[in-house]
Amino acid sequence: KVSRFNQRSRYCLAESYYRNDEFDAARSLFTELYNVSAMYGEKESSLIPYNIAYCFYKERNYPSAVKWFSEYLDQPSVKYRKEALERKADCHFISKQYRMAAETYSLVMTDYMNADDVYPYYQAGLSYGLDNQSDKKIEALSNVLNASPEAQFYPEALFELGRAYTLKDDDENAFGCFRKLAD
């Protein structure tokens, strides 16, 4: 019989592998711990699917990362829900599943609305644009108008909003976006 001390040590070893960019070794150990429910009852137990997902994400195996982020998000209480949703959406985006990406970024926008957290609505806007949904692209990117100009991704999002307005022949709003960027 394997002791709890042994299982927790193996969990920490998997984390060490991850931090040393040895994602395959980390994933293998996390998966083994998950499959045998070795950490059941421990606070780290609920993080195992999240850790497996991140290993796949770092290995650029996006379909598997989506599966494991979903597994993590399906738990009743998750500590890193926003982060998991964003990475899941990123996986969809990278895999050119733009509609699914947009829907997942929109969940982040709805559940964690913060005007200065431009990333989810910038990415949602890009996703809608690549899915030929220009009105939804404008709607998502319009949130940047409430953000601080110092917010990360502010200039990129405002530029994309200006481009979206230009493509819709809305020259007045496009001008407003580009003017803000130029000032």
Which residues make up each language-model segment?
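Acidic, polar-rich low-complexity tracts and alpha-helical solenoid repeat scaffolds
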Residues: K1-D183
